[in-house]
Amino acid sequence: MDIKKFRGSRTCGGGTHKNRRGAGNRGGRGKAGGCKHHFVRAMMRGYSYGKHGFKRPVEVSKDISIVNVGELDELAPYLVEEGLAEVKDGAYHINLENLGIEKVLGSGRVTKNLVVTSEEFSASAREKIENAGGSCIDAE
């Protein structure tokens, strides 16, 4: 900011005449006053400030869409009604690529005979589907 603009005024844009006295108006001198008012109390209670740990780069981490086998088991009849799955030889054939789902996880119970096509299966999901008489087809 150009100080010339404020020449002729008593306080040069600093508010009242009291405001620019001492270092109290800017939280101390130098690097003092970098923290807020209750910082010491927070430190005594053990709160941690600053950066801690490791954050995975965004390029490395991927956000995939998932579904659990329990949800597939419940939704199989509705998917057939909607035309998103079909029943062949007493088994529900579900192609998850068409639904935009990339991975099947193993939470829940499987009671129906499911033939599921997906890019990835967790070990527990594959085991549960095959124990119920179904099969897992890896899409490429």
Swiss-Prot record:
Keywords: Ribonucleoprotein, Ribosomal protein, RNA-binding, rRNA-binding
Domain of life: Archaea
Record carries keyword rRNA-binding: yes
GO MF term (any one): rRNA binding
Single Gene Ontology BP annotation: translation
Keyword Ribonucleoprotein (UniProt): yes
SUPFAM superfamilies: Ribosomal proteins L15p and L18e
Region of interest (Disordered), residue spans: 1-33
GO cellular component, as recorded: cytosolic large ribosomal subunit
Amino acid composition bias (Gly residues), ranges on this chain: 24-33
Function: Binds to the 23S rRNA.
Membership in a protein family: Belongs to the universal ribosomal protein uL15 family.
Assembly and binders: Part of the 50S ribosomal subunit.
Protein name: Large ribosomal subunit protein uL15
Organism: Methanosarcina mazei (strain ATCC BAA-159 / DSM 3647 / Goe1 / Go1 / JCM 11833 / OCM 88) (Methanosarcina frisia)
